Amino acid sequence: MFVLAIVFAFVFIPSSSSVTCDFKNELVSMNWNVKNNKIQIHFEHNNLTENRWTSIAFGDGPGMNNLESIIFSRREDNVITTNSGYTPKKKKVVVDDVSYVTVNDVQITGNKLKVTVSRPLGPAGPRNFSLDQCLNWMVVPGGSLSNGKFKKHHGKIFFIKDVCAAKCTAERIQRINSNKAL
């Protein structure tokens, strides 16, 4: 009976360590958390040069169709812009007339970009896109920017499978970090 109870606990009680609330590699790092039904995303890119863009995309993937995007770009004059948009078909990004993400902080030091944005966790923007369900996230490391237009990206896309952002609350992240320290 005792063994059955232990098996039940492991099978039916979700582990807090299985929640993905961050991503990091040699080029980009980001983490996200939810508070008061808003998601805040802190994103860093280690080599965003002038006239380049990078983005975070959300959707089924791994193909580039029907993805919702947050796009960060660096113009020739070092101005950083943040847009929201979507990809109705591969190789084409349609930028929203009004971005539905709020920029909380942005810094550029050399070629290192640090930006923190927030948006509603639930339906937002012209397509009522929601991040409250588990879905795939993709990081597009970059592409060129020409006359304000986003050109095709180059290089590998980083794929983060089944992100359940709604589970990334401060309390849960603290528990996960405490478990990692053990």
UniProtKB/Swiss-Prot annotation:
Q: Name one Pfam family in it.
A: DOMON
Which residues are in the DOMON domain? 26-143
Looking at the record's lineage, which domain of life comes first?
Eukaryota
Compartments where located: Secreted
Signal peptide (residue range): 1-18
Query: What are the record's GO terms for cellular component?
Result: extracellular region
Among InterPro entries, the record links this protein to: DOMON_domain
Q: Any idea which UniProt keywords this protein has?
A: Glycoprotein, Secreted, Signal
Residues linked to a glycan: N47, N128
In its UniProt entry, what is this protein called? DOMON domain-containing protein Y73F4A.1
Which organism does this record belong to?
Caenorhabditis elegans
